Structures are given as structure tokens and as C-alpha cells.
Amino acid sequence: MTTTLITHIINPLAYIVPVLLAVAFLTLLERKVLGYMQLRKGPNIVGPYGLLQPIADGLKLFIKEPVRPSTSSPFLFLATPMLALTLALTLWAPMPIPYPITDLNLGVLFVLALSSLAVYSILGSGWASNSKYALIGALRAVAQTISYEVSLGLILLSVIIFTGGFTLQTFNVAQESIWLLVPAWPLAAMWYISTLAETNRAPFDLTEGESELVSGFNVEYAGGPFALFFLAEYANILLMNTLSAILFLGASHIPAFPELTAVNLMTKAALLSVVFLWVRASYPRFRYDQLMHLVWKSFLPLTLALVLWHLALPTAMAGLPPQL
């Protein structure tokens, strides 16, 4: 009974609560970064230095009345935000920080598969809202996410060839001598840009272009359901950055200070997240055709070529004696 309680309730909660807290403060950090880049302060009234702002925002959203359009699909309209957040939090299960909650053999494939499922929550919410803006936003989001999934999958394949395993822990072992960022920097650059597109962030935020689509697929959402979408989006941003840190930014385990493993990984993920916000503050939005051309005409040929190269090189060298 106690073991079941620990494995099924306490362990997942020990993962979920810190992730949700991190998401709350990531929203505050985003507003602060954008504020300072626009030469203003950002939130600074609620609590010291505005630190209680995310809590106030969350409370405000959850006590608002969840208005539902009369023509929308009642079940799907409420089910999709829940699905989005559930998927976003489930994705954290195989993350080695430093130990995963479920030690999966195919952790990388699990992450790829579940992040593809997030498309259904976007599509469902856009369709269930019964609004033309929401539907256009959802269709854009689906096309964009599916397109960038292709390049993410191929980049992951290349990186797996480097490390020799689908478990996320093997990346720590493989990068003990050198960060994968050094030999695979073109892959790392394409991976980072693809994660920006995958999480619908600027300059790829076509799906929620305020100037053209009035907020995209979640235009009809208010209160609690909107807050769930919001939490899911930022949890995905943190997840993608944690994954980028695991894949490319070296082993999180420091032999001299093993207890700092989690701190090390969190610092790398936080720095990558700040770059996400920095990009948002700096770059204008892509045009939709440019967004699609980037992945299908630039990233796809490049990643395919690199996969072939990384497959061909070890095969060609396999017959050479080791002393050469």
C-alpha cells in the first residue's frame, strides 16, 4: 500500500508541483525580460519586485466564470485544455533530473510521440470553439507542429546515432568527455529553432498572431480552461529547453559535486528559456509561407543529409583497425 502511494501519488506530485511552480515564475520572468528590453519595469506592484504576480494571475483566471460559446461543442470544448495540460505534464516522466519518474528504454521516442499528440488538443479546441478565427489558428498550428515534428525527429535520430541509445540517461554518459553541442552544432541550431516552432513561440507564433487572428485557437477560452492552455504552453517550453540541455549541453552530473546534478540541469534549462524570451523580444513574426519553406526546403534536406553522413561515416570506418 505504502509503495503504491509513493509510486502513484507522491512521486508524480513531486514532479508536477515544481513544474507548475516553475511555469508560474517563467511567466513572470517573461514579462520582466520583455519589460526591461522595452525600457520599462514589468510587474512590480504585487509583492516584492512583483514576485506574487503569477499567483495573483492564476487566482484571477481560476475564479473567473468560464464562459462557453452557445454554439460550441460542450464536451470537447472543456476536454481539450485538460488533455493539453495532461500531455504537457506526462512528458516530464522520462526526464532524468537526475532520476526519471519512469525509467523508459525508449524515452526519446516517448517524448516525440506525446509531443505529437498535443496537436489533437489544439485541433480539438479550434474546432470545438465553432469560431472561424479559432479554426484558422488551429489549422495553422497543426500544419506547423506536424511540419517541425519531422525535422525534430530526424535531428533526434542523428543525435541517437552519436550516443548509441534511446534512453535519455545515455546522453549523460555519452557527453562526459565533450558536449554534443561542439561536434553537432548545426543539429543543435536547427533543433533549437525547431523547438521554438514546435512550442508556437515568437517568431513562429503564427497560430496566435494577435494582429491577425485575435489570439488563435484559444480565442473563445476564458478563465480556468484558458489558464490550462497557458500552463500547458509554458510547461512545454520548459520541457523542450530541459530536453535541449540533456541532448546537447553535456552531462548534468558533475563528478566532484554529484548533489548539484539537478541544479546544473535546471540552470542550463533556465538559460535556454531566457534565450526563448530574448528571441521573442527581438524578432518580428515570420510570414506563413516563409515558416513552411524554412522547414521543408532548408531544415529537411540538411537534417536528412546529416543523418546519412552520421550513418555513413561509422560504417565506412568500421573496417579500419583501432590503432590508426
UniProtKB/Swiss-Prot annotation:
A Pfam short name: NADHdh
GO molecular function term, any single one: NADH dehydrogenase (ubiquinone) activity
Any single GO CC term annotated in Swiss-Prot or TrEMBL for this entry: mitochondrial inner membrane
Reaction catalyzed: a ubiquinone + NADH + 5 H(+)(in) = a ubiquinol + NAD(+) + 4 H(+)(out)
Ranges that cross the membrane: 9-29, 43-63, 75-95, 106-126, 146-166, 177-197, 237-257, 259-279, 299-319
Entry's localization field: Mitochondrion inner membrane
Entry EC no(s): 7.1.1.2
Membrane topology type: Multi-pass membrane protein
GO biological process: aerobic respiration
Cited InterPro entries: NADH_UbQ_OxRdtase_su1/FPO, NADH_UbQ_OxRdtase_su1_CS
Top class in the EC scheme: translocase
Keyword terms: Electron transport, Membrane, Mitochondrion, Mitochondrion inner membrane, NAD, Respiratory chain, Translocase, Transmembrane, Transmembrane helix, Transport, Ubiquinone
Function: Core subunit of the mitochondrial membrane respiratory chain NADH dehydrogenase (Complex I) that is believed to belong to the minimal assembly required for catalysis. Complex I functions in the transfer of electrons from NADH to the respiratory chain. The immediate electron acceptor for the enzyme is believed to be ubiquinone.
Family according to the record: Belongs to the complex I subunit 1 family.
Protein name: NADH-ubiquinone oxidoreductase chain 1
Organism whose genome encodes this protein: Salmo salar (Atlantic salmon)
Organism classification: Eukaryota, Metazoa, Chordata, Craniata, Vertebrata
